[in-house]
Amino acid sequence: FFIDSSRCTGCKTCELACKDYKDLTPDVSFRRIYEYAGGDWQEDNGVWHQNVFAYYLSISCNHCEDPACTKVCPSGAMHKRDDGFVVVNEEVCIGCRYCHMACPYGAPQYNAAKGHMTKCDGCYDRVAEGK
């Protein structure tokens, strides 16, 4: 999933598209948008000028080369596919949350209603179709 962060306005449409495609509940977000903003006002001969900025970062599972989440999963549910996507087999997952604790990006999320972990799967089905 490529995002040109220099063009990102923080509209969260990518986050909503993910939630819609995966039919996620309001409390679950596989993609999150972070904002970093700052700046100040400066006076120049009685005229005030703004010097403000905002940057946005769209974060999801990074499908790491050497994922920490897969190393701590006792059931083997969290695994890396041959195509590089890190996914959770929800039928095998025991919901121990070790993967969540190990992931530096907070990608695996516990779904209390399902009783197991869920996470971004990189839309590997769409990627396989060339979408």
Task: Give, region by region, the residue ranges found by the protein language model.
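Non-ligating segments of multi-cofactor redox enzymes
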Residues: F1-K131
